[in-house]
A protein has these predicted regions:
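Short, well-ordered beta-strand elements
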Residues: 36, 355-356, 362-371
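Short glycine-rich, acidic/polar surface loops and turns
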Residues: 327, 342, 347-357
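Acidic helix-start/capping segments at beta-turn-to-alpha-helix junctions
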Residues: 88-95
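Short, conserved catalytic-motif segment at the N-terminal edge
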Residues: 2-60, 80, 96-104, 377, ...
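Active-site SXXK
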Residues: 7-13, 33, 59-87, 184-192, ...
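A generic structural motif
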Residues: 42-44, 247, 371
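Short, surface-exposed loop or secondary-structure junction motifs
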Residues: 98-339
């Protein structure tokens, strides 16, 4: 790649810091297995005067989802599950599923299946109030969860929480439309039931330890907290201040292992660790001499597997031109999105972290920050535009 063109990224990243868009961040680009751009900018924690570094620990939030997808496909590779399996076979809370409709609550047309969870087409909701009755009831469940957590009496376990989720009527019939929701959390519970291990233990045994992802977990041990980045939120005045609240079932501020290990949002990691995970996917399930997934399993989750009808609601600005695979977007119409190559896949997180793999060009792009809600799609798109301009003919 043209290193002179890549150097343009220095100015762009520093501008994000200087303008107050982010307190700090890390941008890494890997081409053909080599780090062709790898620089840190600004502060991981302003109050502690902690600079962003290679070993800064970040909250992944929804970049946890691809990890849970891989865990699910490990079970698939071993013949322990089939993607057409009913979720109720593993989680009894999903038996006799009901659906909220304009005419009231009715029985589901069919059972929720594992493939519905992988593709976010199960009809589930996140805890969103004033959207629909299902979202309100999911929010009630999470409120109850927080009450238990903050009372000091412990919370629901992963399996217990997901069984409670299954008792809430769906907002739509299973398999009919895409909707971002707790699907990955439920997959995490299925991993626990099938493997007979806690989700964190399964991930450590089957993914993190084999890949050498030693700083990835559902909490940050005391001896590593001096590397843990602060999380910031933008106020009405546009300025960033530390954020002291948590959502999506995250509690304890990562100081101890949670009872509910959240497959959709709970992990922390470093750029170094997540690079190994991303490269494993890009290499068809293998990193170095270590195989985590079959190439077939990687192909399945990294390609579009939702129908045109389901995709009508997959309409976020950041997903224009993309289809959806196993808890990841996948680029199917690059002429619409204007940046990227057909077959690119990846995902992002609530605090602005983002990764994508481009198999056509053997590229991995990683952008890590800690700002609630991220900083929009334009900064990411312009960074990627410069990356692609640096590709040699």
């Amino acid at each position: 790649m043209n290193k002179n063109k890549l150097n343009r990224l220095d100015e762009m990243m520093q501008s994000q810091v200087d303008s107050g868009m982010i307190p700090g961040g890390h941008l890494r680009i890997i081409k053909d297995g080599e780090r062709v751009y790898d620089k840190c900018f600004g502060m991981a924690d302003v109050a502690r005067n902690l600079k962003v570094s290679d070993n800064t620990i970040y909250r992944l939030y929804s970049m946890t989802k691809p990890v849970t997808a891989v865990a699910t496909m490990i079970l698939y590779d071993r013949g322990l599950i089939d993607l057409s399996d009913n979720v109720s076979w593993f989680l009894e809370g999903f038996k006799d599923q009901k659906v909220e409709t304009k005419d009231g609550i009715v029985p589901a047309n069919r059972e929720v299946k594992i493939i519905d969870l992988l593709t976010m087409t199960a009809g589930l909701m996140y805890p969103d109030r004033n959207v629909n009755p299902s979202g309100d009831k999911m929010a009630d469940l999470f409120d109850k969860f927080y009450e238990r957590a903050f009372s000091g009496n412990g919370t629901y376990s992963t399996v217990e929480m997901c069984n409670e989720m299954g008792k809430i009527p769906l907002f739509a019939q299973p398999g009919t439309c895409w909707n971002y929701s707790v699907c990955a959390d439920v997959l995490g519970a299925i991993v626990e039931v099938v493997s007979k291990k806690r989700l964190g233990d399964f991930l450590k045994d089957e993914i993190f330890t084999p890949l050498g992802m030693n700083d990835t977990d559902f909490y940050v041990p005391a001896e590593k907290r001096d590397r843990f980045a602060e999380i910031y939120i933008r106020g009405e005045d546009g300025k960033l201040t530390p954020c002291d609240w948590q959502h999506l079932g995250l509690v304890y501020k990562y100081t101890k292992r949670p009872e509910f290990e959240i497959g959709g949002a709970g992990l922390v990691s470093t750029v170094n660790d997540y690079e190994k995970f991303a490269q494993m996917l890009l290499n068809g399930g293998k990193y170095g001499d270590t195989r985590i997934l079959s190439r077939k399993a990687v192909d399945l989750i990294s390609h579009n597997i939702i129908t045109a009808e389901q995709a009508k609601t997959f309409n976020w600005d950041s997903c224009i031109g993309y289809g959806y695979g196993g808890l990841m977007r996948t680029l199917i119409n690059p002429e619409i999105t204007t940046v990227g190559s057909a077959g690119e896949y990846g995902w992002d997180g609530w605090t602005g972290n983002y990764f994508c793999n481009d198999p056509e060009n053997n590229l991995t792009f990683m952008y890590f920050i800690q700002v609630c809600g991220g900083n929009g799609i334009r900064p990411l798109r312009t960074l990627k535009q410069v990356m692609y301009s640096a590709l040699d003919d």
